[in-house]
């Protein structure tokens, strides 16, 4: 039901698939995605791939086709979830991390239409590298949004984090599209998921 809600939007439009809804493929013996594998979810494509590799990005989208880019890349904070899950590329030397971000952001910039918006979740401790990588590839940050969670994340720092910053802007070249109203603020209050069972830092 949750996936149907995502694919059908507000539920006012019922979309039908190309096969019988009860015709579900058999679960493979080892249900693990492999690099290069693409899944189609309604009109959407999901790739098991690497957003720093042009060949992977081209499998999903061409130049100047994307209306929006929302990303939650590694924060470079060596995070490990309570269940032991870790994130690849989350503990890199400073200049290597900047280059890693620059590679991914550069490909995203090429995929965006002029005027297309972007949202980049990040760790404030790496704010210089995230903002710098945006600057390096010609993406201008217009605002920094804050996702305020309903509960803190217990950590090792003096102040416990209850928010995550998110860089917001759009690609130059055309006026950007805005789909909200004038009542939106830079603070977005959403409950964090009750458990991070499929990814160490799940978003709502």
Language-model regions: role of each:
Residues 1-204:
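Core catalytic lobe of class I
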């Amino acid at each position: 039901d949750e996936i149907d809600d995502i694919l059908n939007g507000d539920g006012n439009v019922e979309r039908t698939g190309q096969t019988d809804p009860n015709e579900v493929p058999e679960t493979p013996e080892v249900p693990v995605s492999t690099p290069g594998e693409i899944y189609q979810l309604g009109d959407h494509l999901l790739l098991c791939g690497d957003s720093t590799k042009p060949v992977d990005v081209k499998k999903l989208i061409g130049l100047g086709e994307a209306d929006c880019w929302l990303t939650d890349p590694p924060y470079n904070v060596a995070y490990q979830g309570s269940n032991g899950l870790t994130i690849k590329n989350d503990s890199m030397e400073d200049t290597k991390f900047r280059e890693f971000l620059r590679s991914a952001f550069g490909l995203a910039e090429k995929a965006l239409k002029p005027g297309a918006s972007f949202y980049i979740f990040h760790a404030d401790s790496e704010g210089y590298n995230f903002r710098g990588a945006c600057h390096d590839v010609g993406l201008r940050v217009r605002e920094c949004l804050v996702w305020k969670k309903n509960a803190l994340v217990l950590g090792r720092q003096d102040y416990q984090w209850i928010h995550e910053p998110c860089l917001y802007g759009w690609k130059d070249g055309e006026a950007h599209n805005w789909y909200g109203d004038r009542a939106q603020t830079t603070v977005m209050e959403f409950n964090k998921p009750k458990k991070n069972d499929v990814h160490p830092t799940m978003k709502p």
